[in-house]
């Protein structure tokens, strides 16, 4: 047995070499974890970046490993350090790029990100985690210390704030390999790193799309509603970590919608339906926008003629630009309850006050005088 084991022992070229990392070098890798966000259980990605010299560990939660999510996450981590590394060592399996037979092909967005922060990149050999052992260990360490048991948060922003605080707490008690406090060695890294650019990097991936006859476009396998007014048109989708922006020719903004991942219904903004309804107000009776409005407002618009519907919908659309769709609908509902057809000036004024904390908000201004005016009860306002 001894002879058999010796005959199969690793040769001198098969062992692991101990690597020494210069200050200003960063390692990046991904891990997986589960969390409940806004009441929904999600499978998320943990983007981890380390500075091996001081053993400083940072992480960000993302919904995907796509290049726009990765660049946005790294930008957040660089912001925590207040500096950008000179060299980033990545896994060959990330969305940043691929190394095949020694030749690296990077994504266009990551190449732009590199140029913005002025760092160099290096890719590990396949199945060679020891080449970036610092971040490999950090993925498991941070997951065990910050994400067990399964955490629950109200939003992704709240989750990432918690991760940032947890990383700061763990780094405060960490020590680097020579026994010094991590914070002491971190100062050496920061002195070797580059200053952050004065302008933030917009991590956006632009994708040409074509709207179908309903005004729907498809991005990464998920449908987004540009609106019926844009049916059968060629459009441009700007895909960011949290949003999808749809542009028409000459950069005209069509819609900005929340980013969705995986399978599910089409993502829509009720306002994208309004232009088509203004042109064809009778279609309001069967429009999906009804589910986004208060029941009283829907009933009021149903009782209006075509001209009244057009006027009401246009006023909601215009007020939404400054105050948001929900505030505009609440304002229009007040006008309808007063027995009048919503108009631009009245809905805009009420919506602005509601959005600023008035209306039904506790401690907000009393809008009863507006209700009285709309019902004809305030004689001085006639």
Question: Where are the model-predicted features located?
Answer:
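RNase H-like two-metal-ion nuclease catalytic core shared by retroviral integrases
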Residues: 90, 101, 121-143, 159
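Two-metal-ion acidic nuclease core segments, chiefly of the RNase H-like superfamily
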Residues: 103-121
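Acidic/histidine-rich, metal-coordinating catalytic segments
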Residues: 83-102
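Active-site-proximal acidic segments at structured loop/helix or strand boundaries
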Residues: 139-241
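Mobile-element integrase/transposase regions
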Residues: 3-57, 65-69, 203-219
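Protein C-terminal end segments and domain termini
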Residues: 248-382
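Active-site beta-loop-alpha junctions of metal-dependent nucleic acid enzymes
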Residues: 60-87, 260-266
